Amino acid sequence: MVNKIADRDADANIIVLPADHLIIKEKTFLEKVELAFDLASKHDYLITLGITPTRPDTGYGYIQFIEKKEEEFFKVKTFTEKPSLEIAKAFLESGDFLWNAGIFVWNVKSIHKAFQEFLPEMTHEFDTCEYNNDKESVCIETIYPKVEKISIDNGILEKAKNVYVIPADLGWSDLGTWTSVYENAEKDENNNAVKSKHVLTYNSKGNIIRLRNNNKAAIIDGLENYIVVDTEKALLICPISNDQLIKDYVLDLKNFKKGEKFM
């Protein structure tokens, strides 16, 4: 993608955004992006937006920064993949960690140079393609299965010395967890987030309830702060506080005899 854009504009700035995130404070977001574009235009920086954490969440990666007073952006010290709850609590208390939202801004020259330095073999492969013509897709389809499978964080950002972060309070949520879906969903008078046609609740509060099959009904009595998700192949019932354990549940289910058929 860098080569494709650079072929059209050798001085272009790029923003990389996940598709499944919710940003409520749009004005603040645009201001932070404008600052990032300005920095990327003037400096050889790789820039990321870091989200001000509101809780010790083990579902997100974390960015540690080196603070300098009266600055709107800071040099990145470390990236940490999804930590344990104990470590996440320590990160939150320290005050110098942000959530990694996967939002990046850079100039095509800066990111291409970083690819050349840290992922030279991959860069060489894609540099052989011709872009913005009929040959592009065939070339990429040939190369893509052969190159190293690695994230931009592991491949470049954890190694580069010119990575900067802009702290941002965006009203942000990664809709990849049930907790975040619940936080942003419409709720009834008992704070139940129900998105199914045929659900009756009694003495139940603070639950998120999802039924995939609209021809199925559910009656729930006495649950408080639970996740109830019924798919075509599996039923999940667990406390919302155990949201971060769902990946472990899925792994255990896969390890069942013929467990794959429930995925």
Regions found by a protein language model. Give the residues of each.
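Glycine-rich, flexible loop/turn motifs
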Residues: I47, P56-G59, E72-V76, I87-A88, ...
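A short, charged helix-loop
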Residues: F65-L98, N132-N133
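Short coil/turn connectors at secondary-structure junctions
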Residues: D9-A12, K42-L46, T58, F73-K75, ...
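Active-site donor-binding loop signature of nucleotide-sugar glycosyltransferases
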Residues: I51, F65, E81, V108, ...
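A generic local secondary-structure boundary/capping motif
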Residues: A36-D38, G50-T52, Q64, A88-G95, ...
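Left-handed beta-helix
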Residues: V108-M263
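Short glycine- and hydrophobic/aromatic-rich loop-to-beta-strand nucleating segment
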Residues: G102-W106
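Conserved beta-loop-beta/alpha segment of the NTase-like Rossmann-fold superfamily
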Residues: M1-K68, K113-F118
